[in-house]
Regions:
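Walker A/P-loop
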Residues: 1-7, 194-198, 221
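Hydrophobic residues on the short alpha-helix immediately C-terminal to a glycine-rich phosphate/catalytic loop
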Residues: 3-11, 29, 96
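Conserved helix-turn-beta segment of the N-terminal RecA-like "Helicase ATP-binding" lobe
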Residues: 13-16, 23-49, 215
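Conserved helicase ATPase core of P-loop NTP-dependent helicases/translocases
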Residues: 27, 42-53, 206-207, 216-232
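Conserved helix/coil segment N-terminal to the catalytic DExD/H
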Residues: 48-79, 90-95
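Conserved Walker B
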Residues: 80, 84-86, 205
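Post-DEXD/H (motif II) to motif III coupling segment of the RecA-like Helicase ATP-binding lobe
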Residues: 86-148
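Conserved interdomain linker/interface between the two RecA-like ATPase lobes of SF2 helicase motors
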Residues: 128-196
Length: 232
């Protein structure tokens, strides 16, 4: 975000549009731009709650902007930033990109290669002004190094066609003990454990949180949780 803010500062746009997919990211991004630009630029939000149409720098979610394109001139923004632009293959983003005619369009992402083979680079003319790969970031100590463990799990039959039946195998007493065993084996000794587990479905997340509750303080988050619940 700071990289985009400093590039925008160098470009010196009269009107800037910043698109994100989530409200909490929007507020952090706006705060970053306020830090870089100071109080000389009127910045505002265009979301379900705020409609700061007079702002020179407008920060909006893709959903809100996609629903309100007719309120804006095609050339209204001379600089547009698409944050988390690996999402830009979605229809709402494509409508925004196709509608506006900025002098400069910038996309930011840490994961440009999508699993569905949709080409994010093509949306930006295959022009990559700056790229920093994970290995280079690690070598330059820009991010915390990590250790990756591949653990063989023979307790689950992944060939089952019924997804719910397959997921139910994850929460058996035997499998939970297996998970806890490896968590304890690889965790840092004598330090508070903070862990994030990615699950296949909402029901899977709920079931795993409940199954591991006897061993750890657990909670599960889904798209239905609001920002306050996520932060807490």
């Amino acid at each position: 975000t700071y990289l985009a803010a400093f590039d925008a500062l160098n470009f010196s746009p009269e009107h800037l549009l910043y698109i994100v997919h989530e409200g909490s990211i929007l507020k952090r991004s706006l705060s970053t731009f306020q830090t870089v630009f100071g109080g000389d630029v009127f910045m505002g939000e265009y979301t379900g709650e705020h409609k700061d149409l007079d702002a020179s720098f407008l920060f909006s979610t893709n959903v809100s902007m996609c629903r309100s394109l007719e309120l804006f001139d095609k050339k209204q923004f001379d600089y547009i930033i698409i944050d988390e632009c690996h999402h830009a293959a979605a229809d709402s983003y494509k409508k925004i990109i196709d509608y506006f005619e900025p002098e400069f369009l910038l996309g930011l992402t840490a994961t440009p290669e999508r699993m569905d083979n949709q080409d994010v680079y093509e949306l930006f003319g295959n022009n990559v002004p700056y790229e920093l790969r994970l290995r280079d970031a690690l070598v330059n100590e820009l991010i915390v190094p990590f250790k990756y463990y591949g653990i063989r799990d023979d307790r689950v039959d992944f060939s089952k066609e019924n997804e719910r039946k397959m997921i139910s195998q994850f929460v058996t007493e035997d499998h939970c003990e297996f998970v806890v065993e490896h968590i304890e084996k690889h965790r840092v000794p004598n330090q508070k454990l903070k862990a994030l587990a990615f699950c296949k479905t909402v029901s899977h997340a709920k079931m795993m949180a409940e199954a591991l509750e006897p061993f750890y303080k657990t909670a599960y988050l889904t798209g239905k949780n609001d920002t306050g619940e996520r932060v807490r």
